[in-house]
Amino acid sequence: MKNMRVELKTKDMKEFYKIFSESEFIITDDSKLINETVNYLKKKYKNSTTKKKLIPLDLFKAIVLIMMKKIKELDSEITLYDIGYEFGKHLNPKRYSDLKKFFKENNLGTLKVDSRKPLVLKVENCSFCEDLSFEEPICYFDAGLIAGAYECILKKPVVVDEIKCMARGDDACYFKVEVVK
């Protein structure tokens, strides 16, 4: 494996995401990388005139990518799913339209029902996968978020698997939702 250090001072976010998506990339100096990421994003957003209630998407993507790399090193991708699951439960949507609205309002993509039996949700224009290229699905957080949200909607335990991912070159991200029996 090759070691590579990313310095954001000389790179734009698109190049940062491209480097991050390389399969052999290892974070060798986490604190410096995190500081460079935060400083880049502070500079980018300091002139913003609107107050943002949520974390800027670029910052969220960078945080999740860093978490993905560290979690993958530990062979534990389930952790991002668990974090998303708890967040989805925290949202506590009462119906599908609440979840769809959440995705739209937070620029996560356009959530649609692709099929009903089995239940497959489609996220078009997934903002997280934009500019990324991976060999495997990467939306563990989103899968967990959908699982937690759908448990609130259906009042039954569910499991969600990402079956297609834009980061793999698919047209959208697809999530299969199954009730646990």
Swiss-Prot record:
It comes from the Archaea. It holds the Pfam family V4R. SMART domains: V4R (SM00989). Signal peptide: none annotated. Belongs to the M.jannaschii MJ0150/MJ0739/MJ0745/MJ1460/MJ1642 family. This is Uncharacterized protein MJ0745.
